[in-house]
Amino acid sequence: MRDNLLFLKHALQEIKTVWSVTESSKYLVKKMIVPIPFCHNNLIVELGAGNGCITQALLKKLEGQSKMISFELHPAFFNKIMHLSNEQCTIVNDNALNILNFVDSQSVDAIVSWLPLANIGTKVKQAIITEVKKSMKEDWLFIQFQYSLYDYKFLKKNFKSVKVQFCALNVPPAFIY
C-alpha cells in the first residue's frame, strides 16, 4: 500500500518520468520475465526499476555467475531500492541513455524496460533504443511494457520481431512487447 501511495504521489508530480500510479501486479511481473532464458552467465539490464518489484523477481531467477544492472533515474525510487544491490545486482541512479557507461557493447542478454516511452520525446526515445541495441548481444531479448499500443509502430520500425501480449490483471491493464 505504501508503494502505491509513493507511485501516486510522484506520478501526479512528474507524470513524464513516473507514469504509473500504482506498482505493477505480480501477473504483469511474471509475464515480463517468463521469456527470459535464464542461464548461469546472463547479463540482464532493467530500465526504470521503480520500486523494485521486477528487480526482486529477476534476482530470484538469476543463476550462477549471472549479473544484473537496474537503472532508476527518479531519486525517491532509487533510494527505495538501493538495498537490493549485492554481488549479482547493481542499482544505478542514471539515465538509460548512459547504458554503455555500465556495460560493454554487445554484452547484454536481456533488457527489461519499464520506461514510459509514450511520454518520452521521439529524439530521446530513438537515442535510448539506439543505445539499447548497441548494448545487446546478437541473440538478445528486449522486453518493454506500456499501457497502450502508442509505440507499437515505433518498436516495429526499430526491431526485427515485435510480439505483443496483453495483461488484463494489472491496474491499469498493460501491453508487453
Model-derived segments and their meaning:
Residues M136-Q146:
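Conserved beta-strand signature within the Rossmann-like core of class I S-adenosyl-L-methionine
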Residues H74:
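Conserved SAM/SAH-binding beta-strand->alpha-helix loop
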Residues Q126-E138:
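A short glycine-rich, Lys/Arg-flanked "PGG" loop and its adjoining helix->strand segment in the class I
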Residues N101-I111:
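A short acidic, Gly/Pro-enriched loop at the edge of an enzyme's catalytic core
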Residues D3-I36:
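Class I SAM-dependent methyltransferase Rossmann-like catalytic core
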Residues E87-L97:
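Conserved SAM-binding strand-loop segment of SAM-dependent methyltransferases
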Residues N41-G50:
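Conserved class I S-adenosyl-L-methionine
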Residues G52-Q56:
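Glycine-rich SAM-binding Motif I of class I
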